[in-house]
């Protein structure tokens, strides 16, 4: 009978995590309850997905408030109702509008107005109710509403388990208003009676109004629905159908063959292309490739520079679509590391753009795929050690010198009366979400409206952003496109403009075959003169290039891999360098383990790359490439 449960996503108000809510609700004897956070739907998806694991059934909705003042509580009756709530909340958050005291017309939503702050009875619709708190029962008897039991439900706001929860809430409210705890108005805080009451306690309190118990139970039972968490919710298809997606993907891949390989069509390349297209068709990932292709095609039309990186470099199709500039056939990169039958979610393309161009790329995606179906991925900034000490110190009125001292030496706080409170509650609220922000690069492009799954808000970045993070998005079936920013790309663009201005030469930085053959480039690499080159300009990297005399692409790739912590700490980096510099050591290694050496001849039999794990598991363990990748992922 709890239709107004708050979690930590009632920002700077709620105290319990959703897991703690599940546990407390179950302990209190409830089977059904509703998660209705204040102006936030972040917990809704997880509540729908995980409640059954605790033996519970969860309804979801929103507690609509202007500041602390509750206007009404909405509970979704279906997926369509959740979308209505998300649309309503998003509109007000994006436009920074207060909520009216009267809810808009809904078709699939229950609305509960707090007793005493509701529209005239004659205006209440069949899905609208009046919510009564235990401390309002006496007021009911003195009003004309006593005869209208059909419209009464129990509105026991559930925010706390105990007094310590309430104290933490008071601190959060003071932090939110940037005021001293001693001066924070009581009317800007929740009541200490906003507890998770047990079923028996609620029945006892409302025993003289049995109809309200029946109405509340019925409302919750009629608000139960299932959401599909299994299928991919990304835009799919890209065209009108999956089959035409594949036809377009094949056509664009064949066009790319000429750009990448000239008039020749190497047999090995064609076999690899056929294999990849079959796997993409099988997993219905054609739309994912085509959206990335559309993005980089627009970038080229606008003269923007970009780099596709990550495991996407293992895909020949990505190379042919010019999403990446790495030839996976030349480097013997396995497509299975990027896509395989054991991976149901779309893979990640990490695409870097210049910081000057990224916003236009983002705007292009919103314009092309629709404002209602596109959103930036949200993320939560949480309370961490230093921020907690700072904020709690401020609400207790401590001078900044004391706050800094406690931040640097928490034990010193134990000898101060206020410091003890800070230590006590710092651990209590550590990890609580503080406020919503924007993921560094993620963009969601959905087949249906984003508000089927989440509300959105408008950060300073200027694009609608989801109220849930990437992990919840993935649980729902929404997988992000990564549009990143890399300042070095802007410098490359500027450099090429200067070259064209001074020398009249037009340089194609995506034509990597020419760069690989350039003798001056080779000399710069092996002499470690790589200042200004992304990733290979650090002192350690330049020293390594000099040691290896790396003057070709395979050596450069190896150098950029062995310097990573995992390889370098395991001793494989040192062994690779020794074998590279010492022919006798290479010969000895080949004699000792000829099969392993032959398998990884480019790295002298030393496991350097992620692909090497796949190779060894495949050739020595008898696993398929897809199974070997699953082993690699752990």
Show which residues each predicted segment covers.
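Asp/Glu-centered strand-loop micro-motifs enriched in Gly/Pro and often flanked by an aromatic residue
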Residues: 8-12, 27, 263, 279-287
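A contiguous, well-structured pocket-lining segment that forms one wall/lid of small-molecule binding clefts
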Residues: 248-271
């Amino acid at each position: 009978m709890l239709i107004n449960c708050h979690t930590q996503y009632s920002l700077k108000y709620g105290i319990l995590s959703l897991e703690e809510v599940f546990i407390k609700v179950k302990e209190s004897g409830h089977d059904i309850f509703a998660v209705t956070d204040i102006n936030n739907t972040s917990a809704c998806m997880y509540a729908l997905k995980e409640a059954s694991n605790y033996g519970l059934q969860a309804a979801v909705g929103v507690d609509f408030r202007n500041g602390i003042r509750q206007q009404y509580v909405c509970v979704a009756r279906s997926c369509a109702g959740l979308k209505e709530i998300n649309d309503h909340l998003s509109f007000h958050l994006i436009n920074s509008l207060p909520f009216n005291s009267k809810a808009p017309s809904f078709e699939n939503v229950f609305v509960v107005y707090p007793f005493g702050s509701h529209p005239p009875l004659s205006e209440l619709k069949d899905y609208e109710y009046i919510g009564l708190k235990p401390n309002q029962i006496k007021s009911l008897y003195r009003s004309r509403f006593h005869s209208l039991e059909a419209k009464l439900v129990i509105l026991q706001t559930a925010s706390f388990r105990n007094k310590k929860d309430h104290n933490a809430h008071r601190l959060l409210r003071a932090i939110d208003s940037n005021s001293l705890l001693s001066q924070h108005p009581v009317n800007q805080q929740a009541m200490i009676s906003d507890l998770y009451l047990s079923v028996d306690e609620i029945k006892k309190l409302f025993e003289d109004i049995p109809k309200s118990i029946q109405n509340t139970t019925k409302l919750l039972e009629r608000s139960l629905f299932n959401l599909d968490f299994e299928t991919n919710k990304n835009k799919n298809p890209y065209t009108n159908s999956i089959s035409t997606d594949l036809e377009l993907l094949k056509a664009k891949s064949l066009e790319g063959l000429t750009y990448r390989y000239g008039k020749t069509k190497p047999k090995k390349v064609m076999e690899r292309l056929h294999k990849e297209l079959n796997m993409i068709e099988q997993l219905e990932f054609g739309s994912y490739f085509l959206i990335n292709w559309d993005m980089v095609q627009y970038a080229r039309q606008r003269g923007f520079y970009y780099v596709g990186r990550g495991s996407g470099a293992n895909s020949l199709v990505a190379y042919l679509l010019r999403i990446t500039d790495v030839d996976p056939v030349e480097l013997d990169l396995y497509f299975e590391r990027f896509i395989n039958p054991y991976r149901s979610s779309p893979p990640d393309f990490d695409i870097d753009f210049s910081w000057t161009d990224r916003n236009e790329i983002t705007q292009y995606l919103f314009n092309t795929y629709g404002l209602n179906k596109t959103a930036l991925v949200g993320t939560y900034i949480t309370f961490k050690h230093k921020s907690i000490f700072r904020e709690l110190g401020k609400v207790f009125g401590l001078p900044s010198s004391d706050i800094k001292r406690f931040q640097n030496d928490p034990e010193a706080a134990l000898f101060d009366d206020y410091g003890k409170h800070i230590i006590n509650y710092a651990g209590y609220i550590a990890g609580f979400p503080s406020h919503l922000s924007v993921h560094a690069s993620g963009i969601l492009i959905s087949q249906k409206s984003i508000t089927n799954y989440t509300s959105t808000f408008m950060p300073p970045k200027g694009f609608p952003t989801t109220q849930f993070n990437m992990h919840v998005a993935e649980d729902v079936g929404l997988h992000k496109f990564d549009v990143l920013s890399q300042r070095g790309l802007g410098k490359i663009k500027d450099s090429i403009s200067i070259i064209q201005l001074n020398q009249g030469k037009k340089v194609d930085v995506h034509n990597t075959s020419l760069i690989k053959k350039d003798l001056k480039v080779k000399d710069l690499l092996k002499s470690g003169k790589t200042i200004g080159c992304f990733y290979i300009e650090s002192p350690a990297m330049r020293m390594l290039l000099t040691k290896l005399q790396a003057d070709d692409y395979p050596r450069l790739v190896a150098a950029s891999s062995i310097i990573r912590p995992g390889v370098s700490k395991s001793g494989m980096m040192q062994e690779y360098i020794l074998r590279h510099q010492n022919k006798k050591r290479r010969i000895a290694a080949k004699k000792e383990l000829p099969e392993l050496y032959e398998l990884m001849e480019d790295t002298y039999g030393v496991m350097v790359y992620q692909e090497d794990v796949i190779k060894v598991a495949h050739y020595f363990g008898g696993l398929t490439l897809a199974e070997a990748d699953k082993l690699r992922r752990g």
